[in-house]
Amino acid sequence: MAEEVKFSPYEDAVAGIVIQILGRTGIAGEVTQVKVKILEGRDKGRVLTRNIKGPVRLGDIVMLRETEREARRISAR
């Protein structure tokens, strides 16, 4: 009975700060590719490349549900 109850799927999220904006991607440019520095947790200090949907600026704090996966670099065809 000492089981922890999760109220939100985002309870395990880890904070990261946007340190660089790499470009826009997606069919209509609706996704922004950014470099994020992890602020807490076991990957603290690690820099990841992530795709973020919606408005984002340098210095924004984003909550990442997981820190294992990285986005592929944007490439010109």
From Swiss-Prot:
Keyword terms: Ribonucleoprotein, Ribosomal protein
Gene Ontology terms: cellular component: cytosolic small ribosomal subunit
A Gene Ontology BP annotation from the UniProt entry: translation
Alphabetized GO MF terms: structural constituent of ribosome
Pfam families in alphabetical order: Ribosomal_S28e (PF01200)
Tree of life domain: Archaea
Matches recorded under NCBIfam families: PRK04007.1 (NF003080)
Family: Belongs to the eukaryotic ribosomal protein eS28 family.
Name used for this protein in its record: Small ribosomal subunit protein eS28
Organism: Pyrobaculum arsenaticum (strain DSM 13514 / JCM 11321 / PZ6)
Name of the encoding gene: rps28e
